């Protein structure tokens, strides 16, 4: 009804105007205003359902898109929390591995140093023992050589000083000293 009353107001304004160049045709049937009003009413009446359904469909799609986005956001937040937990666990494991590696390195270092000290002591003792053995062997060789030289010298002196008479005298003296023992 608002359209029709607005239309009548427009007609009344046109009748009031006395301008001959431009004007409003007050004859509704001639101006086709009635046909336009009926057509416009039909478009509004029929288009209202289409427009309403189109807007409702669009609203539903937007609502679904928002819900999907919220669900993806929640899933992303859950995945982020899981990833942060895994990162924290990985960092903890890395720290433990570093500590164990440092501890193992210290233990290996201490073991190697201790083994090195033992090896040095063993080599030192073996060296001392080898030196002592070499010294004893050299001393024995020197003593043997001195003994051999002394025997040769005494033998040489004996040959020059020992005559047959002196040999008989030495033998008789030795027999006499052994005299009662035989």
UniProtKB/Swiss-Prot annotation:
It is found in: Plastid, Chloroplast thylakoid membrane. The chain crosses the membrane at residues 33-51. InterPro entries: ATP_synth_b/b'su_bac/chlpt (IPR002146). Keywords: ATP synthesis, ATP-binding, CF(0), Chloroplast, Hydrogen ion transport, Ion transport, Membrane, Nucleotide-binding, Plastid, Thylakoid, Transmembrane, Transmembrane helix, Transport. Pfam families: ATP-synt_B. It is a single-pass membrane protein. The keyword Calcium does not apply. GO terms for cellular component: chloroplast thylakoid membrane; proton-transporting ATP synthase complex. The keyword Membrane applies. One of its GO terms (molecular function) is ATP binding. Belongs to the ATPase B chain family. In plastids the F-type ATPase is also known as CF(1)CF(0). F-type ATPases have 2 components, F(1) - the catalytic core - and F(0) - the membrane proton channel. F(1) has five subunits: alpha(3), beta(3), gamma(1), delta(1), epsilon(1). F(0) has four main subunits: a(1), b(1), b'(1) and c(10-14). The alpha and beta chains form an alternating ring which encloses part of the gamma chain. F(1) is attached to F(0) by a central stalk formed by the gamma and epsilon chains, while a peripheral stalk is formed by the delta, b and b' chains. F(1)F(0) ATP synthase produces ATP from ADP in the presence of a proton or sodium gradient. F-type ATPases consist of two structural domains, F(1) containing the extramembraneous catalytic core and F(0) containing the membrane proton channel, linked together by a central stalk and a peripheral stalk. During catalysis, ATP synthesis in the catalytic domain of F(1) is coupled via a rotary mechanism of the central stalk subunits to proton translocation. This is ATP synthase subunit b, chloroplastic. The gene is atpF.
């Amino acid at each position: 009804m608002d359209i029709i009353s607005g239309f009548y107001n427009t007609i009344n304004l046109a009748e009031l105007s006395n301008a001959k160049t431009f004007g409003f045709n007050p004859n509704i049937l001639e101006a086709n205003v009635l046909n336009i009003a009926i057509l416009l009413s039909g478009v509004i009446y029929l288009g209202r359902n289409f427009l309403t359904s189109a807007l409702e469909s669009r609203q539903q799609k937007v609502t679904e898109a928002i819900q999907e986005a919220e669900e993806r956001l929640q899933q992303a937040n859950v995945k982020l929390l899981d990833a942060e937990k895994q990162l924290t666990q990985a960092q903890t494991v890395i720290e433990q591995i570093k500590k164990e590696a440092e501890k193992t390195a210290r233990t290996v270092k201490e073991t190697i140093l201790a083994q090195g000290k033992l090896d040095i002591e063993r080599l030192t003792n073996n060296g001392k023992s080898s030196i002592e053995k070499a010294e004893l062997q050299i001393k024995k060789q020197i003593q043997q050589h001195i003994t051999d030289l002394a025997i040769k010298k005494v033998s040489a002196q004996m040959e020059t000083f020992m005559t047959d008479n002196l040999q008989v005298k030495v033998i008789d003296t030795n027999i006499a000293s052994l005299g009662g023992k035989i």
